[in-house]
């Protein structure tokens, strides 16, 4: 299962959420998933640049047990490749900060199911277990609860579905 996460590197987008509990991610992801990250930070956004560094450092800690890559030089061409070439689109913004979530829209237009916080367009577009999966509910739950729901659904619904040829 190839998971994609590509967009502007901004703190509210919480690219790091999937790494909240690295042991749990390894437990459910080893041999089951690979993750492709990409994005850019504004040149003056030190926090955004830090997010990219943290993703790269976190990926190294898995030592190949889960394949994780950060593709540099994100642009429209690379975004098109990623949003059409993954099996699942991950979107984990802090509610209620996502204005629209165009990367998830692009993935959906390419037939890629979304796995997302109910914010931006996904708050209205989500048909849980039909066109993707919701992480959490319509309330801002915080990193811990969102991460626990992410891991639970990834393991019990999404990966299991792939094994059963659901996706």
Located regions from the model:
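Donor nucleotide-activated moiety binding/catalytic core segment of transferases
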Residues: 1, 54-105
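Conserved catalytic-core segment of nucleotide-activated headgroup transferases in glycan assembly
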Residues: 1-74, 165
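Generic structural hydrophobic/aromatic packing signal, biased to beta-strands
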Residues: 3-5, 35-37, 55, 68-71, ...
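A short acidic (Asp/Glu
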Residues: 15-17, 46-49, 79-81, 101-104, ...
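Catalytic binding pocket for nucleotide-activated donors in carbohydrate/polymer assembly enzymes
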Residues: 26, 83-167
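Alpha-helical structural motif
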Residues: 47, 51-54, 78, 146, ...
